[in-house]
Design a protein with these regions (language model features):
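Intrinsic structural disorder
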Residues: 1-4, 38-39, 151, 172, ...
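Conserved catalytic region of serine esterases and O-acyltransferases that act on ester linkages
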Residues: 2-3, 14, 62-63, 70, ...
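Alpha-helical cap/lid subdomain in secreted, periplasmic
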Residues: 41, 61-191, 195
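Solvent-exposed, well-ordered amphipathic alpha-helical segments
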Residues: 1, 9-20, 117-130, 166-169, ...
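Short flexible/disordered coil segments
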Residues: 9-11, 22, 44-49, 53, ...
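Serine-esterase "nucleophile elbow" of acetyl-processing enzymes
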Residues: 1-59, 64-69
Length: 219
């Protein structure tokens, strides 16, 4: 079944009844004691639920077998900060430009491998799906912010390439999360930022449910 396709059944194909989030983007965000659903959508028109599946769980279960059978929509959203941190670029200077680029390329390759498998999961499930780019950081140190932005651009290029190849639509968080109030820390979103992402993502899911089959960019 084609990704971004609309499955039969239910009162309306574009009603989000069960959203499955593939990725760890909400893992380190402090949303308080409220249910995640209430933070993302404070006053929903229809009852809905959220299932978060981090990449290791999806890969261990074998792609779409990890996705609940009653899922209606999928969002793919990964915190790429771990990969950028793992590259070591933000912690110490590189001996050479070529060495820094090679280290970054290796980290991006690892990231893309995981990301591609999450896309395969969504395509196999055949549910309306949107993909989120990585969130920009807000490091106070200008040099650190520039390095992070450069690394982020390479990772986002991998996301866009995989998404376009799979004909999945993209929520570009670089344009969504563009205010200081969207961030709780240098690298983590605030509740307000999370809610902005949820609003754009929800609109994107509604549209790809009604008009599947081609890549669009939302922000």
């Amino acid at each position: 079944m084609q990704a971004n396709s609309v499955q039969e059944g239910g009162s309306s194909a574009d009603v989000i009844r069960h959203l499955v989030l593939l990725g760890d983007a909400l893992e380190n965000i402090d949303i308080g004691a409220e249910p995640v659903e209430a933070v993302l959508v404070p006053r929903p028109r229809n009852p809905w639920k959220l299932t978060i599946l981090e990449a290791p769980h999806v890969l261990e279960r074998g792609w779409s077998r990890a996705i609940p059978i009653d899922a209606t929509h999928i969002g793919i959203c990964i915190d790429g900060g771990w990969a950028i941190e793992a590259s070591g670029l933000l912690r110490s200077g590189a001996a050479s430009v070529s060495g820094a680029l090679e280290t970054l390329a290796e980290a991006a390759d690892q990231f893309e491998e995981v990301f591609a498998k999450l896309i395969d999961s969504a395509r196999e499930a055949g549910l309306p799906t949107v993909v989120c780019t990585l969130v920009p950081s807000r490091h106070e140190d200008p040099a650190r912010r520039r390095i992070a932005a450069t690394a982020l651009a390479i990772f986002n290029d991998r996301i866009i390439r995989q998404s376009v190849a799979a004909k999945l639509s993209i929520v570009d968080l670089r344009f969504v999360c563009d205010e200081e109030s969207d961030y709780a820390t240098e690298t983590l979103l605030s509740r307000a930022g999370v809610r902005k992402v949820a609003n754009v993502g929800r609109s994107a899911l509604y549209e790809v449910s009604r008009e599947p089959g081609r890549t669009r960019v939302y922000f």
